[in-house]
A protein has these predicted regions:
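Hydrophobic membrane-insertion alpha-helices, especially the h-region
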Residues: 3-23
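Generic structural "secondary-structure junction" signal
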Residues: 36, 48-51, 71, 150
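Extended non-catalytic domains of envelope/secretory-pathway proteins
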Residues: 5, 30-31, 35-39
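Acidic/histidine-rich, surface-exposed loop or edge segments in extracytoplasmic proteins
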Residues: 36-47, 137-146
Length: 204
C-alpha cells in the first residue's frame, strides 16, 4: 500500500513539475561573467549582448524572458542635473548554473527620459524608481543596450575574481562594507559588498 502511494506521489509530482515548466520555462544560459570580448569596432560583448548594438527586444528573445521595466531617477540638488535611466530587469535567470539578475540600461538621450518621467501619472521627489507599463516600454524596445549589470545570487569572492579577471587596475574603498574594482580595458567595474551580492557592471 505504501509503495503504491509513493509511486502515485512521484507520478503526480512529475506531472506538476512538467505543467509548471510549461508555464514558466527555465532557460539555462552558459554565459559566464568573465566571458568578455570586443567586436572589430571595439564594442564590448558579454552575456551574448553587444553594447551599443543589441536592442532590448533582441535581448528579450535571446534571454527567453520578459523583463520588468523601471525608470530610475537620480535626484541632485539641482533639477537641471537630475538624471534618469530606463532599465530592463531580468530576474531569476539561470546563468552557468547560478540564479542571477541582469539589468540592461536603455541607450536613450536624457531628453527622451525626461519626457518619459514627465508623462508619469504620479511622481515624488523622494522616489527613485518607477514601474513602466509594457505598452510604454514597447515604444522603446528598439533602443540599443548601453550597459549591463550582472547580480549573481552567490558571491564569487576576491580570490576567484582575481583568478578570472586578473588584478584590478584600480581599487577604491567606498565604505567599510563596499569596495570598487576597476578594469577599464575590459570595460568592467566590480562592486564587492560585504553584506550583499557582488555587482558586475559592463560598459563601452
Amino acid at each position: 500500500m505504501n509503495r503504491t502511494f509513493l509511486i502515485l506521489l512521484m507520478v503526480i509530482s512529475a506531472m506538476l513539475i512538467a505543467v509548471l515548466g510549461q508555464k514558466n520555462p527555465t532557460v539555462q544560459h552558459k554565459y559566464t561573467p568573465w566571458d568578455i570580448s570586443r567586436t572589430e569596432s571595439g564594442l564590448l560583448k558579454a552575456f551574448g549582448i553587444t553594447l551599443g548594438e543589441t536592442t532590448i527586444k533582441e535581448s528579450e528573445i535571446s534571454l527567453g524572458k520578459t523583463p520588468e521595466i523601471e525608470l530610475l531617477s537620480f535626484n541632485t540638488d539641482s533639477s537641471i542635473d537630475q538624471r534618469y535611466e530606463l532599465v530592463a530587469i531580468y530576474k531569476d535567470l539561470i546563468i552557468s548554473g547560478v540564479i542571477s539578475e541582469l539589468r540592461l540600461t536603455y541607450q536613450l538621450e536624457q531628453r527622451m527620459l525626461q519626457a518619459l518621467y514627465s508623462s508619469l501619472p504620479t511622481k515624488s521627489p523622494a522616489k527613485e524608481s518607477y514601474n513602466i507599463s509594457p505598452e510604454v516600454a514597447a515604444a522603446h524596445s528598439s533602443a540599443a543596450i548601453a550597459s549591463i549589470t550582472y547580480v549573481p545570487s552567490i558571491n564569487y569572492g576576491e580570490e576567484i575574481i582575481i583568478q578570472r579577471f586578473g588584478t584590478p587596475e584600480k581599487a577604491e574603498v567606498i565604505s567599510d562594507v563596499v569596495k570598487k574594482w576597476l578594469y577599464p580595458v575590459m570595460g568592467l567595474e566590480i562592486q564587492l559588498h560585504a553584506n550583499q551580492s557582488e555587482r558586475f557592471i559592463y560598459t563601452n
